[in-house]
Amino acid sequence: MALIIPEKFQHILRVMNTNIDGKRKIMFAMTAIKGMGRRYANVVCKKADVDITKRAGELSEDEIERVITIMSNPRQYKIPNWFLNRQKDVKDGKYSQVMSNALDNKLREDLERLKKIRAHRGLRHYWGLRVRGQHTKTTGRRGRTVGVAKKK
């Protein structure tokens, strides 16, 4: 960071219900938002014509607004479908970028749907077991331990 802090420097920005550190570079500061990675942040900054070498606190109100609008509706700004984190949604078949609280809600809804239709994945989630085909004979043991009775 520069030795002299600019006059209109914001140390903390509030974007999409998340506090963003103003001292970090904009591309990396945006990754504090849940559902936002470095690659997506980079694309959003380029589409918004924001210099990625700038610190998050140095951005003007106009630049912040542009970044937020592109983050919230990326398909209007020609960000490809394969770049988005919610592809072919089960309910409506749409492509979207889900972030912050909406991401948690979508994940919970997906798990509830899997449990409701009694899918194998849903049942494994319900039982608290490994879901993705891992072995469970020896690893992943937790909870109360069962001791072995000693011979007299």
UniProtKB/Swiss-Prot annotation:
A GO BP entry: translation
PROSITE patterns for this protein: RIBOSOMAL_S13_1, RIBOSOMAL_S13_2
UniProt superkingdom: Eukaryota
Keyword set includes Ribosomal protein: yes
Predominant cellular place of this UniProt entry's protein: cytoplasm
InterPro entries hit by this protein: Rbsml_uS13_C, Ribosomal_uS13, Ribosomal_uS13-like_H2TH, Ribosomal_uS13_CS
Subcellular location: Cytoplasm
Keywords: Cytoplasm, Ribonucleoprotein, Ribosomal protein, RNA-binding, rRNA-binding
GO cellular component, one term: small ribosomal subunit
UniProt xrefs under Gene3D superfamilies: 1.10.8.50, 30s ribosomal protein s13, domain 2
An annotated Gene Ontology molecular function: rRNA binding
rRNA-binding as UniProt keyword: yes
Family, similarity comment: Belongs to the universal ribosomal protein uS13 family.
PANTHER family per the UniProt record, alphabetical: 30S RIBOSOMAL PROTEIN S13/40S RIBOSOMAL PROTEIN S18, SMALL RIBOSOMAL SUBUNIT PROTEIN US13
Function statement: Located at the top of the head of the 40S subunit, it contacts several helices of the 18S rRNA.
Designated name of the protein: Small ribosomal subunit protein uS13
Encoding gene, per UniProt annotation: RPS18
